[in-house]
């Protein structure tokens, strides 16, 4: 049994959870999310608490699935009540970003501007032309979109130029040592 899944998921005020047709639906002030349930888990809703239990007939994989669905439901509850945000910073001469409608336009030191379509459930804003904020209620979509932005120009280890997550540590390498001796 998963240790985390032994604890109930406490629902904040304004968040409702329901189960319909083998799907869990979480509604809150920021929106609603759905997740298909696996047959290995049973969800119990008691008042303002949600419990995740292994199905009684399952002998194989109960702990893994129980922990997975506890985390998925917990993230859904947090997403519809508070939301998720990832912030990226662009470091480099001439690096800048802008949002034009549903397109994120990046100038990242290549010969052409890089244009990334923004998914419907994600909000993107740019501060000071170099800080990109990705917000949404679905943790997976927010993280995936932020990772796609970062993948366009990963931080390089010599000068640290590129797109990185805010407060991300980039391991730096020393450059070539200059020749100092004569033959």
Curated annotation (Swiss-Prot):
The keyword Ribonucleoprotein applies. The keyword Kinase does not apply. Keywords: Ribonucleoprotein, Ribosomal protein, RNA-binding, rRNA-binding. GO terms for cellular component: cytosolic large ribosomal subunit. Gene3D superfamilies: Ribosomal protein L6, alpha-beta domain (3.90.930.12). InterPro entries: Ribosomal_uL6-like (IPR000702), Ribosomal_uL6-like_a/b-dom_sf (IPR036789), Ribosomal_uL6_a/b-dom (IPR020040), Ribosomal_uL6_bac-type (IPR019906), Ribosomal_uL6_CS (IPR002358). GO terms for molecular function: rRNA binding; structural constituent of ribosome. Disulfide bonds: none annotated. One of its GO terms (biological process) is cytoplasmic translation. It holds the Pfam family Ribosomal_L6. SUPFAM superfamilies: Ribosomal protein L6. Part of the 50S ribosomal subunit. HAMAP family: Ribosomal_uL6_B. Belongs to the universal ribosomal protein uL6 family. PANTHER family: 60S/50S RIBOSOMAL PROTEIN L6/L9, LARGE RIBOSOMAL SUBUNIT PROTEIN UL6M. This protein binds to the 23S rRNA, and is important in its secondary structure. It is located near the subunit interface in the base of the L7/L12 stalk, and near the tRNA binding site of the peptidyltransferase center. This is Large ribosomal subunit protein uL6. It comes from Chlamydia abortus (strain DSM 27085 / S26/3) (Chlamydophila abortus). The lineage of its organism: Bacteria, Pseudomonadati, Chlamydiota, Chlamydiia, Chlamydiales. The gene is rplF.
């Amino acid at each position: 049994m998963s240790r985390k899944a032994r604890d109930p998921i406490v629902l904040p005020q304004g968040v409702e959870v329901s189960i319909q047709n083998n799907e869990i639906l979480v509604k809150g002030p920021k929106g609603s999310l759905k997740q298909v349930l696996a047959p290995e888990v049973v969800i119990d809703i008691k008042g303002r608490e949600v419990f995740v239990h292994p199905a009684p007939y399952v002998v194989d994989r109960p702990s893994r699935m129980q922990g997975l669905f506890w985390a998925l439901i917990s993230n859904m509850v947090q997403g519809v009540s508070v939301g998720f945000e990832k912030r990226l910073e662009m470091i480099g001469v001439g690096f800048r970003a802008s949002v034009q409608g549903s397109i994120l336009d990046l100038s990242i030191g290549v010969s052409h501007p890089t244009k990334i379509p923004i998914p419907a459930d994600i909000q993107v804003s740019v501060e000071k032309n170099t800080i990109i904020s990705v917000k949404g209620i679905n943790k997976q979509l927010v993280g995936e979109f932020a990772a796609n932005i970062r993948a366009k120009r990963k931080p390089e280890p010599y000068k640290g130029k590129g797109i990185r997550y805010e407060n991300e540590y980039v391991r730096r390498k020393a450059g070539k040592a200059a020749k100092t001796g004569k033959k």
